[in-house]
Amino acid sequence: MNDLKFTTTHEWLREDEEEVTVGITDHAQELLGDMVFVELPEIGDEVSAGQELGVVESVKAASDFYAPISGVVTAVNEAVGKNPALVNHDPYHEGWLVKLKPSHPDEIKSLLSDEQYQNEIAEEN
């Protein structure tokens, strides 16, 4: 998972060529439990780092998920809209949520590495 960056609000980000893929972490999906609904943003939406991107709803709770960086939504994962359990089964691949074209790519540097994120989780427990 060295290709991933993380937030303290349990989102992950993977850099691709000209966009980034965003989802919620395995830790977050474990805490939430079985997903039953995912609300995604619209393609073309402009978001700022930390702004709400959408909602994931599980049998336990509904939780907002946030933009790890500023950018424009270029794609949403329609598959998780139809089958929210993908977020539980494969949060880092098939269960991705949104793709963004970064407006300030330097914001990625401020995100957590896998090791930093694991330390953050350990402190929460």
From Swiss-Prot:
PROSITE patterns: BIOTINYL_LIPOYL, LIPOYL. GO terms for cellular component: cytosol; glycine cleavage complex. Disulfide bonds: none annotated. CDD domains: GCS_H (cd06848). The modification N6-lipoyllysine is found at K60. Binds 1 lipoyl cofactor covalently. Keywords: Lipoyl. The glycine cleavage system catalyzes the degradation of glycine. The H protein shuttles the methylamine group of glycine from the P protein to the T protein. Belongs to the GcvH family. Residues 19-101 form the Lipoyl-binding domain. Its cofactor is (R)-lipoate. Pfam families: GCV_H. The glycine cleavage system is composed of four proteins: P, T, L and H. InterPro entries: 2-oxoA_DH_lipoyl-BS (IPR003016), Biotin_lipoyl (IPR000089), GCV_H (IPR002930), GCV_H/Fam206 (IPR033753), GCV_H_sub (IPR017453), Single_hybrid_motif (IPR011053). GO terms for biological process: glycine decarboxylation via glycine cleavage system. It comes from the Bacteria. This is Glycine cleavage system H protein.
